[in-house]
Amino acid sequence: MARRTPSQLNMLLAVDKPVGCTSHDVVSQCRRALHERRVGHAGTLDPMASGVMVVGVGQATRLLGMLTLDTKSYVADISFGVETNTDDAEGEAVRTVPVAPELRDLAYAREQLAAMLGPQMQVPPAFSAISVNGVRAYKSAREGNAVDLPPRPVEVYAADLIAVGGEGDTCVWTVAFSVSKGTYIRALARDLGRACDSAAHISALRRTASGVVSIGACHAVEELSAESAAGFALDPIAALGATRVDLPGNLADDLLCGRCIPVERALADFDTAKAPFALVLDGGLKALARIEGGRFVMEHVFPQAIGGVR
């Protein structure tokens, strides 16, 4: 079996996903733009959503599972009066309720949003990528089958009202959310509508941050190329929240072989209490490690250094 050719690009990138395409579409576009096959992403966005999408290229794809634990931030338009089978504007209406006057009251809106804060059990939307007996929930839902998803623990850290709009039979709350991993904003809108004795769905959604990566760090896929990518690379150590440790270049073979390295070989002082430790050689991220018995013990070794370290 032929061995995979090492990636020429190894980095994290922040892409501003446009409305109308899937997360997989963005990955495919990045593969073509960068001429790299090994590309993945951290955290799916629905086709109708836009915003922050962290993409891993080459060795950096191995970091993606560590990034999905991060807090996510969104700005959402929540439209009242209609609940849909997908909990967003792309679905079919399943329940319609006249818009009550109090929904336009700012104090009432803030009170209802405040009640959403904190840990809670959330039932995901039926149209979601969660697997049920090996089948994606959205596939079963599209076939007309009843989808019964168990509630999952999530947490809403912030739900700040930005505006109340809409005219006539419509009322729209624009809300800035900060939530834990696995929280569905569509489900929050659905549950908010019910809590207000109404019906609601998401009519627009934009992810504004994923962990420490904000929308200001993002670039359109059209801006990316194999030549320009290095200038757009995210600092992988900052994205992971790791502690940087610089090591001398003559330890490259030891790192590549996964050998333990004495802590005193570090080129500068660092906080030994703040794991994980990002081991840097010649300006590139070569490994992630923990400390045991005064030595760095390798947890992840990257044969090709991950770029973007600042």
Region roles according to the model:
Residues M1-P18, H24-H41, L45, A49, ...:
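Accessory RNA 3′-end/elbow-binding domains used by RNA modification enzymes
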Residues A2-A187, D191-A217, L288-A289:
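RNA pseudouridine synthases
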